[in-house]
Amino acid sequence: MPECWDGEHDIETPYGLLHVVIRGSPKGNRPAILTYHDVGLNHKLCFNTLFNLEDMQEITKHFVVCHVDAPGQQVGASQFPQGYQFPSMEQLATMLPNVVQHFGFKYVIGIGVGAGAYVLAKFALIFPDLVEGLVLMNIDPNGKGWIDWAATKLSGLTSTLPDTVLSHLFSQEELVNNTELVQSYRQQISSVVNQANLQLFWNMYNSRRDLDINRPGTVPNAKTLRCPVMLVVGDNAPAEDGVVECNSKLDPTTTTFLKMADSGGLPQVTQPGKLTEAFKYFLQGMGYIAHLKDRRLSGGAVPSASMTRLARSRTASLTSASSVDGSRPQPCTHSDSSEGMGQVNHTMEVSC
């Protein structure tokens, strides 16, 4: 991979071009951070608030960041021709190895929201050796049946596409109150994302199949995510039930479940600081950025109790050579707490 690929790229895949934006340059053998946005959004609408945060930039300067836009969802995308077949959710996942290979990434840490979380989970199931860890926000592991399909069709007859998408993105309370954030996203979804292309992506997401994962030991030959996973959802978010169910199907020794209060449907937009703090501890638990300075701690602030628990659940010794030289570390799943908590072998649910 060249010294720096910073900027926009169109990557050829078996299912068409994929728009990708690279920020930064490779850092030794460290994984790339790869993001995938939710339906109705693109990488800018979904992740700009989070990745523009100063504390997040303190983290991402240690990695190359790769933002992936689903086909036809990027700013200024041309409308697909009549009869274009939008890739299935599984096909979207199988497009990602082309991105990884194009830039020479050895493996990635994925951050996905909603539909993007589903795509990244599918990617990790099909290509487990390419995925080092996953942060999955608002993921729904369940497929959509005929009843769901009919309900979606009916909703489409009585609501505009942007309003239908908003009901997927935001909590009922946010929609009823018609918050400034909801108004802003209604306007941007209507004007920034090509509506015909969005309709195709929306239809495909609502035709998805079950992820078909099960917690190890619950069924013979259970298939589940093998990498460390941090699940994130806001209180009363539309995806809350789906994320809870996903949590029940993952390996509890490598899964952290973060339920965020007062964050609504888009925690990466409404609570980017808390999410960044959790992400930092998640990375440290995998053996990365051990010596990252917390800007707020130098001013006398202390981490929230919930984040301290998250750190204890995800972090072991952070002074290993792997944290310094960028070689691939082994996921850490035990505590370094002085309180004698011992090995953590259960899902850590944290509310903050």
Curated annotation (Swiss-Prot):
Q: Residues where Phosphoserine occurs?
A: S298, S317, S323
What Pfam families does this protein map onto? Ndr (PF03096)
The record's subcellular location field reads: Cytoplasm, Cytosol
Instruction: Please indicate if the UniProt record lists Cytoplasm as a keyword.
Output: yes
Sorted alphabetically, the Gene Ontology cellular component annotations on this record are: basolateral plasma membrane; cell projection membrane; cytoplasm; cytosol; endoplasmic reticulum membrane
**Which residue ranges does the record annotate as region Disordered?**
301-352
Q: Which UniProt keywords apply?
A: Cytoplasm, Phosphoprotein
The free-text tissue note of the record is: Expressed in the brain and heart, weakly in the kidney; most prominently in postnatal brain where it is expressed widely in the olfactory bulb, cerebral cortex, hippocampus, cerebellum, thalamus, and medulla oblongata.
Instruction: Specify residue ranges for compositional bias: Low complexity.
Output: 308-323
State where composition is biased (Polar residues). Answer: 330-352
What SUPFAM superfamilies does the record point to? alpha/beta-Hydrolases
GO aspect biological process, one term: negative regulation of smooth muscle cell migration
* Function statement: Contributes to the maintenance of intracerebral BDNF levels within the normal range, which is necessary for the preservation of spatial learning and the resistance to neuronal cell death caused by ischemic stress. May enhance growth factor-induced ERK1 and ERK2 phosphorylation, including that induced by NGF. May attenuate NGF-promoted ELK1 phosphorylation in a microtubule-dependent manner.
Describe the family membership recorded for this protein in Swiss-Prot or TrEMBL: Belongs to the NDRG family.
Stated name of the protein: Protein NDRG4
Q: Which species is this record about? A: Rattus norvegicus
